């Protein structure tokens, strides 16, 4: 089985369409979506409709989905994020707002191997920023492979009986991680719509349960078009500028 794994789309239609096209070229059987479909970007309705059409086998909410649909207040968001999420709420159709509001909270068990969450298995809004965060998340996970998002950074953590390892993606080739028993893994496929690791290309992952391997990819997309849409909709200019920086 090959699972396409996408996270943190953030209403970036140009990035999303490019990722799906590349994933179809690579081949996949099922889809897992790790949350934050909306926020920051200019096309929340189109993204909701496209993701709904995917008929994902695993789909959970992110913090921007909660606030953008009115489930929670934007308390804790910075000024730019608050501006964008209020615009998102105002511009979402009632159908898409209700659909987002009904998305389930993570973590979610997918199968005997895979669990998904937005932030961590113990708190959907918590971040994995360092080794201690990663260790705590892996100990809380109920499956050998836990897929997470929220940080917008591609990374893979491995915990074996005698050591803890970290694998980071670079800009030259996809990062593949062999899934060996009885190790535990915590993998972030990166952000589709707003990468924050210095690489502006859209990120995604594919888990092959037969080959017991997870691979995380990057793909170039028409950033200028996404930037133009943000400016066109009157969202903060910084949200357009950061797409070219990958920050």
Q: Can you name each region flagged by the protein language model?
A:
Residues 2-99:
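Core catalytic region of metal-dependent phosphoesterases/phosphodiesterases
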Residues 70-72, 127, 157-160, 227-229:
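Short, well-ordered secondary-structure micro-motifs
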Residues 2-10, 113-120, 186-190:
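Active-site-proximal beta-strand elements of phosphoester/diester hydrolases
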